[in-house]
Amino acid sequence: MVEDNVRIGTLIDYWMKHNEEHAETYMKWAAKAASAGNEKLSRILVRLYLESKRLNRLFEAAKKAHC
């Protein structure tokens, strides 16, 4: 359906933006965790950031496939 095709394009854009916002938050809190002396938590949050960036590459691929 045409409506579904339009909707999925809108959703992909939304998901990418939302994911990017989360990624930036993870880095902010990773720095705070490191400052508080919790290196283990900081490393995990950095990994979450990196995984979020990887997901955004998949969203980019989905966006290209959608067009």
Could you say what each language-model-derived stretch is?
Residues 1-29:
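N-terminal acidic leader/helix
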